Amino acid sequence: MLILVINNLAQKKKFETLQKSLDNKIKIMDKLIKSSENKALILNKQLEAFIYYLYNFKNDSSIYQLLKPKSVVGKKKIRIGSLKDGGYVLLNDFENIKFAYSFGISNEISFDKDLADKNIDIFMYDHSIEKLPFYNKKFHWKKIGLTEKKNYSNNMKTFKELLQENGHTNEKNMILKIDIDGGEWNIFSDIDNEILLQFKYIVVEFHFNDLCISQYQKVFKKLNKNHQIFHLHCNNYDSIIKFDGCYICKALEISYIIKENNSFIKFNDFFPVTNLDYKNCKKKMDINFFLNVYQFDNIISN
């Protein structure tokens, strides 16, 4: 029996329930570890993450709480894009979606191709490449980068400028995908909420670097105002880091859906989710089991 000593936990009854359930949860977590290498160390970190979450499960400003996923009632998750790096999880609901915006292209456009196959026009931007890997009549690419402030450069524009150029200032029900290697923090810090409301889905690969915790909190609180996280995935090309007392992946893929006209229930999936989650790097160990810290909600409430 695993014994945890945790002080200052107000709800003793819930903690007793946690102690009784934790051993079984550890066994389940153990099965999710894809490699026996450093297994004890990995499991120890997972337990530390659980304990930290337990301390903070009522703290709305903790990173774990700001990233808490929920399930969407009546909607099924599907994978869009490749079964490796470049694919993301959305829902099987594309009704009335005509346009998508994709920032950060490089040479991986399987996500964009799958959306194009659904008759969605993709407005694609990346100032670091010379051309797309292949042509599609639904692709609308420009060698332009995304910036948070107007800077009068020919190859850098704000989100608002791009929406105006494309005639989408009043468009709703769009899809947004952003993977711009750390630039996402300033973009989301400065973007108007009215622009975010134009997007039904928002999928982002967030890169945790040297920014202070307050900027992370600001961005996630802003996104959580009108959108709900329904899926998380760790990019295993990078590693696990610890900041503000918690473990998190340095590159974390997050899928949001707009709250309006949707209902949500408690999240009950274990990561990685079969047939949805795939390793970004097939040669490296999967690290998505760290996200199962959210199973504490189910332990505490049962």
Give the residues covered by each predicted segment.
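SAM cofactor-binding core of SAM-dependent methyltransferases
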Residues: 75-153, 208
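A short alpha/beta connector and helix-capping loop motif
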Residues: 186-208, 213-220
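Structural motif
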Residues: 98-99, 175, 201
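Residues that flank catalytic or metal-binding motifs in active/ligand-binding sites
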Residues: 137, 198, 250-252
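A short acidic (Asp/Glu
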Residues: 111-113, 134-135, 186-191, 213-216, ...
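Boundary detector for helix-to-coil junctions that initiate low-complexity/charged tails
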Residues: 1-43
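Rossmann-like AdoMet/SAM-dependent catalytic core
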Residues: 25-94, 108, 154-172, 208-302
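Switch II (G3) loop of P-loop NTPases
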Residues: 180-183
